[in-house]
Regions:
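N-terminal leader/targeting segments and the immediately adjacent pre-domain N-terminus
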Residues: 1-142, 168-171
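Active-site-proximal loop and beta-strand segments within enzyme catalytic domains
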Residues: 104-105, 109-117, 132, 143-150, ...
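A structural signal for well-ordered alpha-helical scaffolds and beta->alpha junctions
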Residues: 110, 190-191, 215, 240-241, ...
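Aromatic-acidic/polar surface patches that form glycan- and anion
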Residues: 117-120, 124, 149-152, 233-237, ...
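Alpha-helical scaffold elements that line and support the substrate/ligand-binding pocket
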Residues: 131-134, 151-170, 197, 234-265, ...
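A small/polar active-site loop signature that marks catalytic segments
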Residues: 202-278
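Penicillin-binding protein/beta-lactamase superfamily catalytic region
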Residues: 223-228, 233-234, 258, 273-315
Length: 315
């Protein structure tokens, strides 16, 4: 259980820390990436560099900078918003009311909503109510025009695209994966149906491991994964999403980024471009975790879900 300790001294400054599992971490205010000056300078001094080479991208507190700067760290491809104006998000500001809300946390302490945002290292938050923005705040490295890593929310975008292609008859979810992608014959997906992949009901020899190097989006790696047993039981795994994206691209002749652009970014009237992290070797997307998007454009996608696929008067 997390324990919050007030005004402990960290380094030469008096700052607040959070304690978790016996370790202390700078809190949301003290870990603000703007205060650390990550990647500033020409070139940045060694102790301010955030790179995969020095293994600081996923290290706290550098992580609070890297999640809003992934295209400076990895190869990416653009998701273009088009030349038209963005769709309007009406505002009905209730920030003062929401910031003042209080609740009792797991440690029986009364806490204000605004303080909880700092305690949970929030980079940005936007609340839509019936299509109107009632609350919007940004912290640290994030700003309204800056894209933030979506991580596994990317899977929701990929699944939405796949469901639309099935609905339109472009994809037949009863077919096996090897019928779409012959390169996956002899793998764990050879006899899995597209529907089983879409529902993460494959039984392949893969375990989600967030402590090792992620290879789950690489075609060469996917071809090494074998079957462990009968398909049909749900097990969460990102490799299924990457196989699904491979199927979509093979069937449509469009990349994952192009499908996002044509079927979501343009129709939704998104405000900013997005970008997708890709395999530097062959350009294949990290469809399980590689989308980076602004908070308002993420809200537009959420509103599309709330309205059951209806947007700007179109289904």
């Amino acid at each position: 259980m997390t324990e919050f300790k007030q005004r402990q001294t960290v380094g030469n400054a008096s700052e607040s820390v959070l304690e978790f599992d016996g370790q202390q971490y700078l809190d949301g205010r003290a870990s603000d990436p703007r205060e650390f000056g990550w990647m500033r300078g020409a070139p940045p001094p060694p102790d301010k560099r955030v790179t995969f080479e020095n293994e600081t991208v996923w290290t706290f507190p550098q992580l609070r900078w890297s999640l809003s700067h992934m295209r400076e760290l990895r190869p990416t491809v653009q998701v273009w918003r088009g030349r038209g104006g963005p769709s309007q998000l009406e505002c009905s500001n209730r920030s003062t009311e929401i910031d003042g809300l209080t609740f009792v946390d797991m440690d029986d302490r009364t806490n204000r909503f605004e303080e909880a945002l700092f305690d949970t290292y929030t980079d940005g938050i936007l609340v839509l109510h019936r299509g109107r923005i009632i609350y919007e705040r940004y912290f640290g490295a994030l700003a309204p025009h800056v894209q933030h890593s979506c991580q596994s929310i990317t899977k929701s975008y990929a699944g939405t695209l796949a469901a639309a292609l099935v609905h339109e008859g472009i994809l037949d979810d009863r077919k096996t994966i090897s019928q779409f992608v012959p390169e996956l014959r002899g793998t764990g997906w050879e006899d899995a149906t597209l529907r089983q992949v879409m529902d993460m009901q494959t039984n392949v020899a893969f375990t989600e491991d967030y402590t090792s190097v992620d290879k789950s989006y690489r075609c060469e790696y996917l071809r090494t994964i074998r079957k462990e047993g009968a398909h049909g039981k749900f097990v969460y795994k990102g490799v299924d999403t990457n196989v699904m994206a491979w199927v979509m691209s093979r069937a449509t002749g469009r990349s994952f980024a192009q499908l996002l652009q044509e079927r979501l970014w343009l129709p939704l009237g998104c405000e900013e471009d997005a970008y997708v992290e890709i395999d530097p070797g062959n350009g294949m997307p990290r469809a399980h975790s590689g989308l980076n998007v602004t908070l308002r454009d993420l809200a537009r996608f959420g509103e599309l879900m709330r309205c059951e696929g209806s947007c700007n008067g179109k289904q």
